[in-house]
């Protein structure tokens, strides 16, 4: 039998498959990549056992757990654990603290299926703490630089072009603006933090000591950046990306209209997808009505409605440029100009996309760690 493990670093670096035997309610609050939920108890069973533990102690709770998970139900769950173990001979299982639940699953696998399967010592809590410390250590020990620029200038493309970048919006599955929602849901907060930490861990393992981030607010959709990282971002040097207004409009048209419509249609089907996409754009615009002001909002909303009608009818996207241009000129650009004033002393380079990518690569080569 392979030994139980405390080698948390290797689990994440090597993408080792993990079986989470916690209840679904625990799993959905946060877990790890390469993990599947094969619970010992469902949510109701867990609640009953927890109540018994509080009222009557550990032995009574264990006895109740064995009563609740027995017979055909036990056989069904055992079959799921057995299937995972056979499909993932290099994997591990874990519960919240690496205690009774994971030990019981180990015992049942051994007794009833003849399978020795190791667990993660310390369980979910130890893995989570390890990743938390991974992010904290990077903030303390590494060099960071931010990429800023006006809406639509292509900051995400710069992040994608660099091998030492951390894609905050990618990990959050959100573009970070009022219009940033994707067709698929955002991860849970803990999942977002875990994905980011694993990204940091893998890049540091490859020797990266200098990271490039997009200049973000604290909240990316519904995901909050780790506090230590966000606090550091208030002082990190800034590289400012520039692009022509017309190019920015075309990029937004591509990303937020053409590609996003296709994304919604892939997820929920053509007819429902276009309806969901249309509702998303209109809701996003309505979400900033107070900041736009009533008259401006009504004018841009009318252009958006007309644009969606034309797009739905014949696929034309030309009218979308009207509300995009209006939002940039009358809302986003003035807002960014105001915010940039407080960051001006941190700007160490300005340039177009090719120049910024070249500068950041040179910066990494000169100061790799």
Curated annotation (Swiss-Prot):
Top-level taxon in the UniProt lineage: Bacteria
Family named by the database record: Belongs to the SelU family.
Reaction(s) the record says it catalyses: 5-methylaminomethyl-2-thiouridine(34) in tRNA + selenophosphate + (2E)-geranyl diphosphate + H2O + H(+) = 5-methylaminomethyl-2-selenouridine(34) in tRNA + (2E)-thiogeraniol + phosphate + diphosphate; 5-methylaminomethyl-2-thiouridine(34) in tRNA + (2E)-geranyl diphosphate = 5-methylaminomethyl-S-(2E)-geranyl-thiouridine(34) in tRNA + diphosphate; 5-methylaminomethyl-S-(2E)-geranyl-thiouridine(34) in tRNA + selenophosphate + H(+) = 5-methylaminomethyl-2-(Se-phospho)selenouridine(34) in tRNA + (2E)-thiogeraniol; 5-methylaminomethyl-2-(Se-phospho)selenouridine(34) in tRNA + H2O = 5-methylaminomethyl-2-selenouridine(34) in tRNA + phosphate
HAMAP family in the record: tRNA_sel_U_synth (MF_01622)
Residues in Rhodanese domain copies: 12-136
Active-site residues annotated for this sequence: 95
GO biological process, one term: tRNA wobble uridine modification
GO molecular function: transferase activity, transferring alkyl or aryl (other than methyl) groups; tRNA 2-selenouridine synthase activity
Quaternary structure, from the entry: Monomer.
Protein name, UniProt field: tRNA 2-selenouridine synthase
InterPro entries given in the database record: P-loop_NTPase, Rhodanese-like_dom, Rhodanese-like_dom_sf, SelU
Organism of origin: Pseudomonas aeruginosa (strain ATCC 15692 / DSM 22644 / CIP 104116 / JCM 14847 / LMG 12228 / 1C / PRS 101 / PAO1)
């Amino acid at each position: 039998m392979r030994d139980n493990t405390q080698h948390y670093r290797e689990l994440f670096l090597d993408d080792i498959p993990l079986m989470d035997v916690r209840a679904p309610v625990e799993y959905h609050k946060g877990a790890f990549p390469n993990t599947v939920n094969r619970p010992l108890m469902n949510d109701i069973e867990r609640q009953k056992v927890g109540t018994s533990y509080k009222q009557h102690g550990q032995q009574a709770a264990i006895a109740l757990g064995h009563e609740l998970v027995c017979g055909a139900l036990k056989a069904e769950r055992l079959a799921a654990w057995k299937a995972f173990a056979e499909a993932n001979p290099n994997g591990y299982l874990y519960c919240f603290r690496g205690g009774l639940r994971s030990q019981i699953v180990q015992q049942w696998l051994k007794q009833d299926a003849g399978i020795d399967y190791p667990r993660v010592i310390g369980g979910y809590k130890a893995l989570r703490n390890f990743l938390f410390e991974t992010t904290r250590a990077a903030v303390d020990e590494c060099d960071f630089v931010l990429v800023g620029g006006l809406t639509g200038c292509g900051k995400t493309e710069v992040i994608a072009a660099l091998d030492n970048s951390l894609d905050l919006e990618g990990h959050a599955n959100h573009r970070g603006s009022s219009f940033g929602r994707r067709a698929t849901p955002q991860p849970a907060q803990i999942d977002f933090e875990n994905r980011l930490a694993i990204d940091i861990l893998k890049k540091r393992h490859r020797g990266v000591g200098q990271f490039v981030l997009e200049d973000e607010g604290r909240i990316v959709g519904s995901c909050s950046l780790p506090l230590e990282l966000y606090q550091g971002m208030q002082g990190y040097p800034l590289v400012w990306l520039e692009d022509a207004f017309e190019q920015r409009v075309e990029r937004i048209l591509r990303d937020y209209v053409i590609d996003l419509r296709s994304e919604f249609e892939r997820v929920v089907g053509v007819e429902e997808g276009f309806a969901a996409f249309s509702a998303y754009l209109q809701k996003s615009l309505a979400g900033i009505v107070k900041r736009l002001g009533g008259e401006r909002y009504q004018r841009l909303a009318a252009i958006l409605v007309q644009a969606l009608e034309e797009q739905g009818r014949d696929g034309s996207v030309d009218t979308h440029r009207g509300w995009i241009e209006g939002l940039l000129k009358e809302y986003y650009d003035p807002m960014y100009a105001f915010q940039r004033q407080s960051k001006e002393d941190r700007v160490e380079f300005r340039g177009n996309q090719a120049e910024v990518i070249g500068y950041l690569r040179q910066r990494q080569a000169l100061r790799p760690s």
